[in-house]
Every structure is written in C-alpha cells, then in structure tokens.
Amino acid sequence: MSGHSKWATTKHKKAVVDARRGKMFARLIKNIEVAARVGGGDPAGNPTLYDAIQKAKKSSVPNENIERARKRGAGEEAGGADWQTIMYEGYAPNGVAVLIECLTDNRNRAASEVRVAMTRNGGTMADPGSVSYLFSRKGVVTLEKNGLTEDDVLAAVLEAGAEDVNDLGDSFEVISEPAELVAVRSALQDAGIDYESAEASFQPSVSVPVDLDGARKVFKLVDALEDSDDVQNVWTNVDVSDEVLAALDDE
C-alpha cells in the first residue's frame, strides 16, 4: 500500500528526466481540459481545475500548454476532444488488485490496449466490482518534507478533515474524504506549507505484500499499462517493503 505510493513518487521524479516526460505532460493536460469542461474555465471557482493546473505547474508543464488546455476545456478555443472516463479492474501477478482509469476519446482502443498490456504481463481482467471493493476513493494531498515533521502537517490539517498523514520517505501524503480535499489543501496553504499535488485517488483497504521478484512483475505490468496514452491512472494494493524498494531503485 504505502510501497506503491513510494514507488509512484520515485517514478514521478525519474519521469521528469526520461522519455516518460511527454506522456506525463499529456496526462496532466488532459486533466486540465476535462476539469475545465466539467466545472468551468475559472480556477477560482473550480477547485478541481485549480488543483490540476497546480500539479501541471509543479511538473514543469509550460504555461502556454496549460492555458491552451484550459481554454479548450472551457470552450474558449476549438480542438477539445470528447474525453470519456472508463474504469477497468483486474489482477497483477501474486494476486495484487489493479484499478485502471482511462481517459480516452476511443473506448474500443482503450479496452484493447488495457487487455493486451494485462495479458502480456501476467495480469488478468476482472468483472466490474470484483476488485474495486478493495479500494476507497479518498482525497490525497502530497507534499515534500522540506524540514517538516508529521506533527507539523497534522497540526495544520487535522481540523480541516484530514484522516491520516503517511510518511513516504522524502514526502508526506495527507488522506481525507474527497469532499474535504479542498479544505485540507487550503489549510496547508493557510499554514504556509507548500504542496505538490491535491487530487482524488483510490486507497486500498487491504494490501498484498510481495518480495523482490513479485514487485518486479507488478511494476512491469503497471509500466506496460502506463505506456498506453489512454491510461490516466493505475492503482494497486501492492505492499513493498523499504528493502525491496531500495533493491528496485538500484536496478
């Protein structure tokens, strides 16, 4: 559970300097476009758009790309795609549960790419509802430590509705109900604490521990899924120990 968060954080940092940067940018741009289409193009009145823009800025997406995506979503500029969100469920090797969120303009292509990635990497597709019950939708705010302690963060967010603060090594993640996400993010801002991202996510209620070989197989599958332009997010309930994580980082 926490292991997957740590791995995602590590991969995010590496993604800034490797070939996945372009795919990461594309996902962030899609988020902005969809948020503007659903809730309007003014970030001040659309918290989801505000958070999508902030995350893109933190990831060094050029401002002009961000603004064009906002305008396309809001209908101020032509060219916006008809993005649809589709969820797929399945299992990775070792019985690890996988939730796959696609944001696509072609449902058939998305379904095909997800199935191929799963099949070729030891995964199996599952019926709707047979995996998702293992996860709860939560609000997640991620922030770099920058000298902060867990108590510092808790003091800032506890009254705003935060449920938990997880230590991810170099960063913290603050968990809340999705409805409290904006309040938690605002509480951090009011306390002068900078944050990396604030978004709705899926948190596993039960985790599956794996050894080094198991972790390799799970993350090989996750990487294959994330190679699809239609896949927006992948969540698993894998639990990776610090020792296994360190061994993966060395590979």
UniProtKB/Swiss-Prot annotation:
Q: Which InterPro entries match?
A: Integrase-like_N, TACO1_YebC-like_2nd/3rd_dom, TACO1_YebC_N, Transcrip_reg_TACO1-like, Transcrip_reg_TACO1-like_dom3, YebC-like
GO MF annotation, one: DNA binding
Q: Which UniProt keywords apply?
A: Cytoplasm, DNA-binding, Transcription, Transcription regulation
Q: Which NCBIfam families match?
A: PRK00110.1, PRK12378.1, YebC/PmpR family DNA-binding transcriptional regulator
Q: Which GO terms of the cellular component aspect does the record hold?
A: cytosol
Which subcellular locations apply to this protein? Cytoplasm
Give the species this sequence originates from: Mycobacterium tuberculosis (strain ATCC 25177 / H37Ra)
Q: What is this protein called?
A: Probable transcriptional regulatory protein MRA_2631
The UniProt record lists the keyword Transcription regulation: yes
Q: Write out the similarity annotation.
A: Belongs to the TACO1 family.
Domain of life assignment: Bacteria
* Alphabetical GO biological process terms: regulation of DNA-templated transcription
